């Protein structure tokens, strides 16, 4: 078994998502039994937070919400009817109260990952492969520290193994990164780099042979190439130096 984790920009509409699908299919055909972990696609998380800000301020958010759904539904047969209703209800509540608590914010941003997993699963089905979208909140159990929750590892491990043991043979699981639920079933998120953490936990729980983390850049750079034009790719790097750079 291999864990394949894909970042948000690599999952965006266009050539990015097509490359992701090719990687998943290649691994499946090679007999790697891939388990896929996905972030929210593109700038979905930023768009959801912007919607919350508009709703909090009592501003009209309908046009921005429509643009959000147009982006999510591009190049897919999915229309996310249930999620549309749920998200509209959530934004209406934020607008009515004029605030977005950390708990509500976790519920709101979770839609980015939920929609992403469904999108990728459907895209694989359209290409003739059996795939299933899995909400990591169905097995990741955390405390109630909304925005940066801590995982209860043993409880999560037990739930994870039970869930995956029940999946049909040959199906490709598409798992949400970043999101979980507390012991009361309320939505939580794992904070910065939460999707990578989710993937690492999954690799540990399922005793995967390997975890591969895919991003939209082709290596480690001296700075963020999206921000610093002069950033250079580092050809060779010791593990200790990589760990230092990640801090």
Give names to the regions the model predicted.
Residues 1-247:
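Nucleotide/pyrophosphate-binding catalytic subdomain
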